[in-house]
UniProtKB/Swiss-Prot annotation:
This is N-acetyltransferase ECO1. Its main location: nucleus. GO terms for biological process: chromatin looping; DNA replication; double-strand break repair; establishment of meiotic sister chromatid cohesion; establishment of mitotic sister chromatid cohesion; mitotic chromosome condensation; regulation of mitotic nuclear division; telomere organization. Its EC number is 2.3.1.-. One of its GO terms (cellular component) is nuclear replication fork. It is found in: Nucleus. Residues 102-261 form the N-acetyltransferase domain. The gene is ECO1. Keywords: Acyltransferase, Cell cycle, Metal-binding, Nucleus, Transferase, Zinc, Zinc-finger. Probable acetyltransferase required for the establishment of sister chromatid cohesion and couple the processes of cohesion and DNA replication to ensure that only sister chromatids become paired together. In contrast to the structural cohesins, the deposition and establishment factors are required only during S phase. Acts by acetylating the cohesin complex component SMC3. It comes from the Eukaryota. A zinc finger (CCHH-type) spans 29-53. Belongs to the acetyltransferase family. ECO subfamily.
Amino acid sequence: MAVNHVRSKSSNGKRLVQSKLNINNETILKCPKCEMKYSPNSIDDVATHKKYHDLHINGRNWSQTWGIPIHDTTSSTIIATPSSSPFKTGKSVNNKNNERIVMIQENKPAEVKAMLEIMDIVNQELNAPQDENNFWRKPNAEHQGKAIVYIKDKKVVGAITVEVLKQHKCRWMIYETRTLVEHVRPQFTLGISRIWVCRAQRGKGIAEKLLDAARISAIPGQNVDKMKLAWSQPSDSGGKLAKKYNGVKHKSGHILIPCYL
């Protein structure tokens, strides 16, 4: 098997490397952006890669009629809802980019199906199980958890799923070592099962907005403090986000992150 590398520059000047594998005279490419492997000689492979690439990089198309706009009850504000929205309550923000945050309605099959497609993407990137959606997708799951998405220019570019926690699952995690603190049982309210932002929109504060939206809307009538929000086995990037969002410095000098099993 031979391995060749095709080098090019991206629009931001970074050098990209596209790997080319020759297996039994069949060329297999690895996309330097979405990291999918495919055969450029296969029509099906090329089509599959095009769809996969667009979803991972730019997000998923989203109907303007899907989801319930999320309100900040402390300021009577609809979070990131465009001025053209039929929902006129409160003050809108981020109108110029046509951005909004909505909650998935578990009794709407089209919304649930679309969200499950997004979760496929999320779980592929995180190498996480694909069967952890029942707490937000079942019609009787009102008080078990919620799924929330961030929409920009009619595409879902970010998503979060949160679940109501049972106290025996709550722990503190030492950020530097990724180990749990023994014999301490803190009390947290919401667990972040998944959080994701498409690659083209990372570093723009979308993850933090999703976290805030989840805190104020996941439990009806309750605005959850950010220190009551726990993380589930965060990835490297997730750990950095957790440290920034609600990590606390212990007297030992270590950073502690609220997490759950």
